[in-house]
Structures are given as structure tokens and as C-alpha cells.
Amino acid sequence: MEIKAAIVRQKNGPFLLEHVALNEPAEDQVLVRLVATGLCHTDLVCRDQHYPVPLPMVFGHEGAGVVERVGSAVKKVQPGDHVVLTFYTCGSCDACLSGDPTSCANSFGPNFMGRSVTGECTIHDHQGAEVGASFFGQSSFATYALSYERNTVKVTKDVPLELLGPLGCGIQTGAGSVLNALNPPAGSAIAIFGAGAVGLSAVMAAVVAGCTTIIAVDVKENRLELASELGATHIINPAANDPIEAIKEIFADGVPYVLETSGLPAVLTQAILSSAIGGEIGIVGAPPMGATVPVDINFLLFNRKLRGIVEGQSISDIFIPRLVELYRQGKFPFDKLIKFYPFDEINRAAEDSEKGVTLKPVLRIG
């Protein structure tokens, strides 16, 4: 079928809106008409080849839409369902079978390499040339996408569907890093480095978790103001104050839970050094490939736990509907992070995101 998609054809290149041909759904696939799609930092990192994915490619991995058709083996959703599209996992490796799909051993290819699970190219341009697709099992910078049963999450119809796409990645990552991975007990303290969409989602999740001290660290005052509005009890601007010293003025021994969302190695070092003995430091920010940080191993030896977190360690079929319900109850107001753009202004949305003008751009598609 003919669809419209935003294609990146060269490193650092623009998103080009083109009419392309999309395959019919295979037996395990779902054809989704996109209503809106979030634009995520990972889309831009891959566009610019900091992660070397093949080009040309249709990116987009925070899709929300309506099921149009399903393959013969699909049972979880049916035409007319409202869905959020998230990351692909195989469902058959040890990690998936153990209930930890974010550690899937077979997820890299289907999420990043531009082909379906069976190795097919699912999008061709008007000249018949292959265009990479199936990005995160969806490629949702398009009017329609092919997803899989495993990365298609059914959601309620009584919440605006155009809001929900970012729950598939960025917001799920921030909230899940707190609620699923770090899991701080009520009454505890957490420091969150970086107050972008992921970091502010973590702030809101810390409120849900019952943390009584929530420290947000960022160099942009407008983001810190929003962090306070969303529940941060303390804000620190590293441009004005050393964040390690500022945190230790609040907690002399450091904080028990720390989350680093910026992807900047120097900030990760600050996050580690802000932690208490026995503390846990989660890393979700995506630095350039090969980035390293200098850390005194003896500092970590004192029962500190340094861990990477993928997609908030979420089981999306469970976690995304929970976030939707928290939003419905007014306990997780992630809509305050979102700014909408028409699909044909995708390049402006990307520029605004890179400049920090917009926290979470969402493209209205159909």
C-alpha cells in the first residue's frame, strides 16, 4: 500500500517526506494507522550516525495509532483498537522467558537494522529501491506502520490517543527507571541528573513512588522550574553550583538513589560521586559510542551499584497501561512535557528538540 513517510537518506541529513510502498502485514504483524508519533533523542542519534544504523531509513519509535489490520497469528489486538507501539523483543530468549524483555538477546537487529524479523525490507521508494524500516519494530514517522504483536500495546480509548506515543519509549524509560528498576521505597531520596523528557518523567515517577526528597539537576532554568512544578523538592543548576557539593549540603553522605539521563560522561561522573554508600546509580542517557568515565573503583567498592537501564526495565503490556491510568487520575501529568507539530514540520520539531526549545515533540500525523 502507498503511505507517506519521513526518510533520512544521509548522515546528518534532513527528514524527507516521500510517498513509499509498505508491505502487507505478515502473519505476526499489525498494520497501524498512525495518529501521532513522539520524536525521541534516539531518532536523532541514529539519524546522525552516532549509532551506525543503515541508511536510508524511516525512523520513529513512539507511535500511537489505530489498528487497521492484523496478521493471521495475531491474537492480542484487533482492528479498531487504540495502541501504543514500543520496542521489539523476541519473546523466546532466556531473558524474555524470565520476564525481563528489556534484556532480550535478540532485540538489536529487529530494532536497529532496518529489516523485519525475517530479514525482509518492508518499505520501498517510488523507484523500487529498498528503504530501511522496522525501526524499533515499527518505523512510525509515517502515516502507517507495520508493528508486531509483541511491541503493540492496547490502550484505553478514553484518553486522547495523540498524547500516548511517547509512553512507548522516552516517558516509559524515565518512569520505569524509577518505578521498575531503582524502585526507591516511600520516604526515600533520589537525585535525577538531566531534566529533559526522560528526567522529568523520572521526577513524576518519584512522586508516585512516594519519595520525599527529589533533587533535579539541569543547566536550563526553565526545565528546573518545570521540575519543581512536577514535584522536585530541590533543584540544582550546575552552571551556578557544583552539583556534588550542593547535593551533599542536602544529604551529607550522598543520596541512596541516583539516575543519570543526560548521556554526558562528565555528568555521569557527577552522578556517581553524589551517591551514598550502598547507593544505586542508574544510567539511561545515551552517550556517543566509545564514551568512558574516570571513576575510582574504590569508591564503588563501598556497596555502590552502577547499572544500565533499558526502556525503564518495563514489561510494556503491563507498564504502559499503568502510566495511562496514573495520567487519568492526575498523578502523572506527562502532557506538560509535550508540544505538538504537524507531520510536515518534522525538521522543525527535531531542531527545537536539539536546541532544548521543546522537551517532547509529538508529530500529529492523521
UniProtKB/Swiss-Prot annotation:
<protein>
    <recommendedName>
        <fullName>Aryl-alcohol dehydrogenase</fullName>
        <ecNumber>1.1.1.90</ecNumber>
    </recommendedName>
</protein>
<dbReference type="InterPro" id="IPR011032">
    <property type="entry name" value="GroES-like_sf"/>
</dbReference>
<keyword id="KW-0560">Oxidoreductase</keyword>
<dbReference type="GO" id="GO:0008270">
    <property type="term" value="F:zinc ion binding"/>
</dbReference>
<keyword id="KW-0862">Zinc</keyword>
<dbReference type="Pfam" id="PF08240">
    <property type="entry name" value="ADH_N"/>
</dbReference>
<dbReference type="InterPro" id="IPR013149">
    <property type="entry name" value="ADH-like_C"/>
</dbReference>
<feature type="binding site">
    <location>
        <position position="93"/>
    </location>
    <ligand>
        <name>Zn(2+) 2</name>
    </ligand>
</feature>
<comment type="similarity">
    <text>Belongs to the zinc-containing alcohol dehydrogenase family.</text>
</comment>
<feature type="binding site">
    <location>
        <position position="104"/>
    </location>
    <ligand>
        <name>Zn(2+) 2</name>
    </ligand>
</feature>
<dbReference type="GO" id="GO:0005829">
    <property type="term" value="C:cytosol"/>
</dbReference>
<feature type="binding site">
    <location>
        <position position="61"/>
    </location>
    <ligand>
        <name>Zn(2+) 1</name>
    </ligand>
</feature>
<keyword id="KW-0058">Aromatic hydrocarbons catabolism</keyword>
<dbReference type="InterPro" id="IPR002328">
    <property type="entry name" value="ADH_Zn_CS"/>
</dbReference>
<keyword id="KW-0520">NAD</keyword>
<dbReference type="GO" id="GO:0046294">
    <property type="term" value="P:formaldehyde catabolic process"/>
</dbReference>
<feature type="binding site">
    <location>
        <position position="169"/>
    </location>
    <ligand>
        <name>Zn(2+) 1</name>
    </ligand>
</feature>
<keyword id="KW-0479">Metal-binding</keyword>
<feature type="binding site">
    <location>
        <position position="96"/>
    </location>
    <ligand>
        <name>Zn(2+) 2</name>
    </ligand>
</feature>
<feature type="binding site">
    <location>
        <position position="90"/>
    </location>
    <ligand>
        <name>Zn(2+) 2</name>
    </ligand>
</feature>
<dbReference type="InterPro" id="IPR036291">
    <property type="entry name" value="NAD(P)-bd_dom_sf"/>
</dbReference>
<comment type="function">
    <text>Oxidizes primary alcohols with an aromatic or cyclohex-1-ene ring. It is highly specific for benzyl alcohol.</text>
</comment>
<dbReference type="GO" id="GO:0051903">
    <property type="term" value="F:S-(hydroxymethyl)glutathione dehydrogenase [NAD(P)+] activity"/>
</dbReference>
<dbReference type="Pfam" id="PF00107">
    <property type="entry name" value="ADH_zinc_N"/>
</dbReference>
<feature type="binding site">
    <location>
        <position position="40"/>
    </location>
    <ligand>
        <name>Zn(2+) 1</name>
    </ligand>
</feature>
<dbReference type="GO" id="GO:0018456">
    <property type="term" value="F:aryl-alcohol dehydrogenase (NAD+) activity"/>
</dbReference>
<dbReference type="InterPro" id="IPR013154">
    <property type="entry name" value="ADH-like_N"/>
</dbReference>
<comment type="subunit">
    <text>Homodimer.</text>
</comment>
<keyword id="KW-0614">Plasmid</keyword>
